[in-house]
Swiss-Prot record:
The chain crosses the membrane at residues 156-176, 180-200. This is Glycerol-3-phosphate acyltransferase 4. Its main location: endoplasmic reticulum. Its EC number is 2.3.1.15. It comes from Mus musculus.
Amino acid sequence: MFLLLPFDSLIVNLLGISLTVLFTLLLVFIIVPAIFGVSFGIRKLYMKTLLKIFAWATLRMERGAKERNHQLYKPYTNGIIAKDPTSLEEEIKEIRRSGSSKALDKTPEFELSDIFYFCRKGMETIMDDEVTKRFSAEELESWNLLSRTNYNFQYISLRLTILWGLGVLIRYCFLLPLRIALAFTGIGLLVVGTTMVGYLPNGRFKEFLSKHVHLMCYRICVRALTAIITYHNRKNRPRNGGICVANHTSPIDVIILASDGYYAMVGQVHGGLMGVIQRAMVKACPHVWFERSEVKDRHLVAKRLTEHVQDKSKLPILIFPEGTCINNTSVMMFKKGSFEIGATVYPVAIKYDPQFGDAFWNSSKYGMVTYLLRMMTSWAIVCSVWYLPPMTREKDEDAVQFANRVKSAIARQGGLVDLLWDGGLKREKVKDTFKEEQQKLYSKMIVGNHEDRSRS
């Protein structure tokens, strides 16, 4: 047997006391408040302190750049090309006017100068298109002391470098272990709690317990990300028998919304840890999980969703119609499937503040584990959530028009760019129909004018 020396025994005792104090503080200041949905204001104080530090760091960088006669890097938030919203016909008219005095309606079917319009548009798209930049992290106006968010960082001063190093120590040596412990606590309680609730007979008591177990666990997971969330217009929160649709930036969108409401999730059945969580959750709550073979069957998916929303006693379904993660600067095309069902739609706009950490998941660049590690080593996740008034499909409106109307409302409320492009372009090639659409517009302009002249 090994005998501990007095000094070694002292170290072991101190370590034991430290861990006891740490877990007591964790329980009192984080887990218990999460269970009851209360906050002591520590996270908001932390956020205000960070803002002051960021402001000071930005001033130091600007001063250092001025002393060295260097221009401080500023991202082009509105794109590198100034674009006016004009139609194809108007732009070609302008090109023809600048080349000759002929007007469009007196011009033959085709002019060689028309080529310049398509060449210019092609060059603009290569340099700064609307779609590709939505699939990469949003650039910041000022550095937030995270090396991965600063694309042009150079040594400025000793104090700023020390501050950055201190930030690395705090994030990796204190916040990361704390957040991992909270994440395991939240996930563990979710699996155990929902499994136990699943054995209870169906009824109000089971529903009550299931709701509070879900809320408790999601709130603990929210604290594992140091998420500071502001909810607006809670009177518009989704109700039973409806569909909640939101813009999609990250997998944590689910946790953000589920920590303030009780939803039925929709998704594909997974294996591993995710599969264990899914099987436990579905025992306590009627979530809608699909097998891999069923996901591609659009009619089967629509049928399952319709059956769910027709039962007004069932929870609102949470759906992200974009189908992929966008970098929270815009909202892209909504898939029409969830708008064909005929249920009341509850739009929700989610807007993250990238100053404290980039919530966007670039799935083509980072795996889930790497992404979660980046989240847990960020300063915090700060976001605003707006619950919009419920919307229903109008009589003269098809599913696509309804989806676009909901999308526009979300984009307007969240201060996001409303785009018609499909988020599927993140992984797929541009369809020929997009190219043909431009050809049709041009041919319609030429042939249309020619036919009008023939009739006259």
